[in-house]
Amino acid sequence: MSEIEPGVIFTFILGSVFLISLLSDFLFGKKDGPFESYYRSGQLKEKGTHKDGELDGLCEEYYKNGQLSEKGTYKDGEPHGPFEGYSKNGQLEWKGTYNMGEECGEWIEDGETVTYDPCPPDLEDGN
């Protein structure tokens, strides 16, 4: 590989690529734009978007077997909106909504329903 495209960061350990982060840009020294990181095997580990150095928008994390582990939305670096967590075999383990980092509304955890303070109206439908 003689050229590396702008915005692509490679991290090498003992000559092998173990993490590749694809960043669309840095804005004033902060991560800004979509990113992906990978396990040493090359399997996708996580993907999402940064805005002004913080997670913002949909973010997904994966197990080493490629199965989705967790997905949820962020706003200004805080969990904000619907989140779901899965087992290594793909079964839904938990599900709920965050309001700027705080659980709200009904959550399903290990098959049980847990109720927190109500979500604001703009989050009631999972937005």
Describe each PLM feature range:
Residues S2-N127:
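Glycine/tyrosine- and acidic-biased, solvent-exposed loop/turn segments at the edges of beta-strands
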